[in-house]
Amino acid sequence: GDWVKSTMSLIGGAFGLVGSITYLYLIFIRSSRKGYQKSRTTKKPSSKLVRTFCGPVTAVVLTIAMLAGETVYLVYAMRATRAEATASSQYISVSAHRGGARKAPENTMSAIKYAVDSMSDYAEIDVQETSDGEIVLMHDTNLKRTTGLNASIWTLTYDEISQLDAGVRFNKKFRGEQIPKLEEVIAYAKGKINLNIEVKYNGHNQNIVKKVVKIIEDNDFVDQCVLTSMNYNFLRQAKKINPDIKTGYTMKMSYGGLEDMDAADFFSVKYTYITESFVEHAHSLGKEVCAWTLNYQGDMQRMVNCGVDNIITDDPELVRKV
């Protein structure tokens, strides 16, 4: 694999470095002897320029330059080898963001089906509560962006929401796509794909965690999902109801104090704030790191090198190419 090639390059660089040091040493020894012999039989060059650029001084300068270059190469080779060895030994799971929002209307059944077809490990979805207590898939608190209706989700019943078109604004071929209930999505996903269920806090859904956990338990789906939220108190509630539910704390930044976050089994962090040291610290606490939301190969490769455990993306097929 690539990491084997990097290791061979690393070994070659090490031999080159040793060789350069040896060569530099021999140059000094040889120059010292010749200088001593010539000083007894010949005159020194009258020009300082000639003395500087003729003979051993030039060789020494060139050797030092080569030595510096090989040292830099060796450092970079060591870092690349470590990163590639880590990447080759660790499986990184893939989550389709909102089901795969680049290929289908977000948080719809079509998006979940795409996540399955793209062989994603997880479909990441967002859930909120309607005015009559139904748990549905929706990211925004306002329905305008995805359905065209300028209304807050907590002001409408499920019957009213079910009449809205959640697909046509994405593409006409998805005309008639409905906003699904969490139960519908779980029923379809069972045995096909895991779900990352992000519980949104909007100030109007204080009992949403209890309802979401009940739906998960009633459908025997605990082992096939994780529950995440930016509201840490929601994670506490979930763990209190059912300690077996795997929970993740969604963060826009990589905060400190990870040791105190007992209600979180893993951390879901915006990729721009993830560093290798953060991942190592989380892993030392026995907690995984999920990176969101990546849609470019360069960013994905950096996260692979950092050692993250899961990548959330709108384009899961692209991640497999990294």
Which residues does each PLM region occupy?
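Short, acidic/polar
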Residues: 104-114, 180-185, 209, 250-260, ...
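Cytoplasmic membrane-interface regions of multi-pass membrane proteins
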Residues: 27-47
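Hydrophobic alpha-helical segments
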Residues: 1-34
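Internal/C-terminal transmembrane anchor helices
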Residues: 41-79
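Membrane-interface segments at or immediately adjacent to transmembrane helices
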Residues: 74-124, 128-131
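C-terminal active-site rim and adjoining tail of enzyme catalytic domains
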Residues: 53, 74-81, 249-322
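Metal-dependent phosphodiesterase/phospholipase catalytic core, i.e.
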Residues: 139-246, 264, 269, 283-285
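Hydrophobic faces of well-ordered beta-strands that scaffold small-molecule active sites
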Residues: 94-96, 123-125, 195-199, 225-228, ...
